A protein has these predicted regions:
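A non-catalytic, helix-rich entry segment at domain boundaries
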Residues: 33-106, 331-376, 674-703
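Long, compositionally biased intrinsically disordered regions
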Residues: 335, 339, 344-357, 583-708, ...
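Acidic, Mg2+-coordinating catalytic module of metal-dependent nucleases/exonucleases
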Residues: 227-230, 235-301, 312, 540, ...
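C-terminal extensions
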Residues: 278-280, 294-449, 665, 672, ...
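Pre-ATPase regulatory/linker segments immediately N-terminal to the P-loop/RecA-like helicase/translocase core
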Residues: 208-259, 563, 576-606, 753, ...
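Conserved DEDDh/DEDDy metal-dependent 3′-5′ exonuclease domain
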Residues: 120-129, 139-146, 161-265, 425-586
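Metal-dependent nuclease catalytic cores that hydrolyze phosphodiester bonds in DNA/RNA
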Residues: 1-157
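Accessory interdomain/linker segments of ATP-dependent helicases and helicase-like nucleic-acid enzymes
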Residues: 12, 28, 33-74, 638-779
């Protein structure tokens, strides 16, 4: 019989995979027939993580028991102590409905188990009838029973019952996910149906709002909250504390997910042979029991999921159009055959990503890194005087970091040619965590922040004595966004501590936690880069499924040893996992609890882990420290190779670094947020515009950003159009207007009539932000002289033109746009006739070759708003002077 336990439902939502569900529903014999064994893929130490979750549950159960009156909470305990839990586990209660029949039910029931009615939904009933599904029993963590009339929405006929039952699911995670929300909704739906079947419908109703009891770094938070309400004289302090602690799950949202599972997915998967169930290997598969099996199958059949960043929906669209392998995708995109044309007619995203996907596919075939044609990145600088590399590893359950690493490469001012850079590297290990208390993390964060801030302060201090042209730049590199988010979470968690706030002041300005408004100047300076996103943008690598750090580093122009073999970044068994950029967090639990499962791999017994020697605690500590160091080295290698091999594609320009507070920090308090919001909005728009313009022209068109394929309309056809416009709009009589036909595939561009922040350039023009004089290779004074001779620069007020960007010279206004014509066309007028003619004369644009229109960004508002709000007045907040570090 097929088995459907509550873990299968929750994990199906986590992995979103039909094959996973089919394998979980299969019998052992069915799985064995395919050579699938979930136990083969278990990670050593994973039981510690499960035990930590159960321990947190048990602690919260005990909190509820200890703060409630005797007899108000029904529970049972096992007879023996569980060594991993450090206590007797709670035992399931099997007589739930007998308890509910009591004249006065308890306030809470812990781990009450009941059978899910087969008629929960018609689909589930059909699964039982047609496929012999095993009867399912579920066990919500806590049933909280309250007198009716709380105002909570109820499942059922809406009448107020004598009692309401609220489902509570205890989770160690501070931020519950979709799987948690669907799980608690499933419990609520199942219990509501079971209560009706038991004939309790008139007395009990189940709350439609299931709840999550989330994790907290203060293990006594609930007990303290109960005491607070007791001190306030609350009639029911326990219920008040629960109401404040719990996260409510909107039933109407997640009911749809649960019912769709039973009505559609479950039946569809049960009707499918195991080998035919749909699947797609991606980053979310990291902890799936069957991931190795699927990766092997993907390699055997050249599965489309081998392409990093291709999602399952896109892969299914490709397959529906006859493209089933990465090799076929390469052929289809390269030849632009009918299959690919059909795909891009259905998906603008695939149209935009086509060249990158084809490059990734070719790289897999050829086994070498390949650049994506035409792409550039405005997210990473080609050079910085100081480069800081950061890696952070954490436990996603508790949210606590267990390893932080920072390294720097610094070229000081005044160094001589050939002088080596200053290098430094620091590793910080959180070696003790008791009951989710982040105190040790706080101490390591203070050490980490002190080191990185001192590196930044050193450059900033040097720059105060240098002229602008000689000031040193500084930039911070992370591998992926997870590390940045974790850094911000640590700041958020500890910033109220007086010992921490001054130490992290500089870093929070550049990487503010969610509760702080970003500093606009720091934000605009783009202080850091997510290197993985740069690789995604620029390079195809021979790495399947996802660009993990080590796989990327080992395939991206690796260093070569003296014997000619490539150097590999590698870690011992247990310190790295496929498709993950984090040190396995089981190692942290082993270190924190002194219960070590990981063993040294033994070449003499490669398939018998029982003969491998366990790590000692010191060896484990050193192993985590070494793993953190290797992560830093791999990150540095990738950045170095990007700069060596693709320097011309890295277009972010960095100015001299300053750690000084921005002027916005001295603005009156009432105006500060308004000014910051406006400046942040402007900075976001400017960066988005610059990043999009760094894409190849076909991608810009596919994102509806640009109008491409512009060619001058024959004069005989253009003249009547121009005459009609000038007749209807006399203000254009003295102007020179141009009429261009453009590509029909650009009809849906967001550029509209009346837009005047638009530049026209040849399709091979790469950088509209480059000053025209630098492009022509002339200095400021020579450029000024040339403009003076042309009558373009007549006074000091015109000197801005000397340093104008190419985009400014090529700025035009859209006078008319006829996108729906059989041959679409656009009519434009120069923004500045003199500058435009100057650009034509100096071959900055050739109207005889194919052209493209790109939106520009100019900030017209932030300066005015800043001035107006400063004029309103008010006292600025006092500036705290950071004390000197020793």
């Amino acid at each position: 019989m097929a088995k459907l336990d509550k873990g299968t439902l929750a994990l199906t939502f986590k992995f979103d995979c039909d094959r996973f569900l089919r394998f979980r529903l299969a019998s052992d014999a069915e799985r064995d027939s395919l050579g699938v064994s979930a136990e083969t893929y278990k990670r050593p130490g994973i039981e510690l993580i499960k035990a930590a979750g159960r321990r947190w549950e048990a602690d919260k159960y005990q909190d509820l028991i200890d703060t409630s009156d005797d007899g108000k909470v029904v529970f049972l305990l096992e007879d023996k102590v569980d060594d991993l839990l450090g206590r007797k586990p709670f035992k399931k209660i099997q007589n739930l409905f007998d308890i509910l029949r009591q004249q006065e039910p308890p306030q809470a029931i812990i781990e009450a188990e009941f059978t899910v009615p087969t008629n929960l939904t018609p689909g589930l009933q059909k699964a039982y009838d047609d496929f012999g599904l095993d009867q399912v029993r579920v066990r919500p963590d806590i049933l909280w029973i309250r007198p009716g009339g709380t105002g909570a929405p109820l499942i059922g006929n809406g009448t107020v019952p004598e009692y309401e039952i609220h489902i509570i699911d205890v989770k160690m995670a501070a931020e519950p996910s979709l799987r948690h929300f669907t799980e608690v909704t499933y419990y609520a739906l199942a219990l509501a149906t079971a209560i009706q079947q038991e004939g309790f419908g008139g007395r009990y109703a189940v709350s439609a709002e299931g709840t999550i009891w989330p994790g907290s770094h203060d293990i006594n938070a609930f007990r303290n909250l109960v005491q607070l309400y007791q001190a306030k004289g609350a009639a029911d302090p326990v219920s008040e504390a629960l109401s404040e602690t719990l996260i409510r799950v909107p039933y109407e949202v997640y009911e749809v997910h649960v019912k769709q599972f039973f009505e559609d997915r479950l039946l569809r998967v049960l009707q499918t042979d195991m080998e035919d169930a749909s699947w797609h290997v991606g980053p979310k598969c990291q902890l799936c029991d069957y991931v190795r099996y699927c990766r092997d199958k993907a390699s055997e059949c050249d599965h489309l999921s081998r392409l990093a960043w291709l999602n399952q929906g896109q892969a299914e669209l490709l397959r529906s159009n006859g493209i089933t392998t990465t090799a076929e995708l390469t052929e289809a995109v390269t030849t632009a055959d009918d299959r690919w044309q059909s795909v891009i007619d259905s998906s603008h995203q695939l149209r935009a990503d086509g060249p990158a996907l084809a490059t990734r596919a070719r790289s897999l075939t050829e086994g070498a890194p390949l650049p994506v044609d035409g792409r550039r990145s405005a997210m990473i600088p080609a050079w910085t005087d100081q480069s800081i590399f950061i890696t952070i590893h954490f436990d996603p359950g508790s949210g606590i970091s267990f390893a932080l690493g920072a390294a720097r490469l610094y070229f000081p001012h005044g160094r001589k040619p050939g002088d080596p850079p200053v290098t430094d590297e620091k590793i910080f290990i959180v070696d003790r965590v008791d009951a989710m208390n982040p105190e040790t993390e706080r101490e390591r964060l203070k050490e980490f922040a002190t080191v990185v801030s001192e590196w930044l302060d050193e450059v900033s201090t040097v720059n105060t004595g240098l002229p602008a042209r000689d000031r040193l730049s500084s930039h911070i590199f992370f591998w992926d966004m997870l590390e940045v988010r974790q850094l911000k979470r640590m700041f958020e968690r500890h910033m109220q501590n007086p010992d921490v706030i001054e130490l992290i002041e500089v870093l929070t300005r550049f990487f503010p936690p969610d509760s702080l408004l970003p500093d606009p100047d720091a934000f605009k300076s783009q202080p850091g880069t997510i290197v993985k996103e740069v690789l995604r943008m620029l390079v195809g690598l021979p790495v399947a499924h996802d660009y993990s750090l080590f796989d990327a580093a080992n395939s991206f122009f690796p260093n070569v040893r003296e014997d000619g073999t490539p150097y590999k970044f590698d870690l011992p068994f247990g310190f790295a996992t496929p498709m993950s950029d984090q040190i396995p967090f089981e190692r942290a639990y082993e270190l924190w609890q002194d219960k070590i499962f990981v063993r040294h791999f033994n070449k003499l017994h490669p398939t018998d882990p029982s003969k491998w020697r366990r790590y000692t605690r010191d060896e484990l500590y050193d192993g985590i420290k070494r793993a953190t160091k290797v992560h830093l080295q791999a990150l540095q290698h990738i950045v170095r190779r990007l700069r060596e091999n693709y320097k011309d594609r890295l277009v972010l320009k960095k100015s001299g670094f300053s750690a000084a507070r921005s002027s916005q920090a001295s603005v009156p308090e009432a105006a500060r947020s308004l000014i910051a919001f406006e400046k942040l909005n402007v900075a976001c728009q400017e960066m988005e515009n610059r990043n999009t313009r760094s894409l190849p022209v076909d991608e810009r068109e596919a994102r509806f950003f640009s109008i491409r394929g512009l060619t001058l309309k024959p004069q005989a056809e253009a003249d009547p159009i121009i005459d009609e416009i000038k007749f209807a709009n006399p203000q254009y009589q003295p102007e020179t207007l141009y009429v261009f036909d453009f590509s029909p595939t650009s009809r849906d561009s967001r550029i509209k009539e009346g837009d005047f922040l638009v530049a026209i350039s040849n399709e091979n023009r790469e950088d509209l932000d480059e000053p025209w004089r630098k492009f022509l290779g002339i200095d400021f004074y020579s450029a000024k002289s040339i403009l003076e001779e042309r009558g373009i620069c007549r006074s000091k007020r015109d000197e801005w033109k000397v340093n104008s960007s190419i985009g400014k010279l090529l700025q035009v206004e859209i006078i008319a746009l006829e996108a729906m014509r059989e041959t679409p066309y656009v009519v434009i007028k120069q923004g500045n006739a003199q500058l435009f003619q100057f650009a034509l004369d100096n071959a900055l644009v050739d109207l005889g070759k194919k052209l493209v229109l790109d939106p520009l960004f100019v900030d017209f508002t932030s300066k005015r708003i800043d001035q107006a709000l400063r004029a309103v007045g008010g006292k600025a907040a006092p500036i705290k002077r950071a004390r000197k570090r020793r």
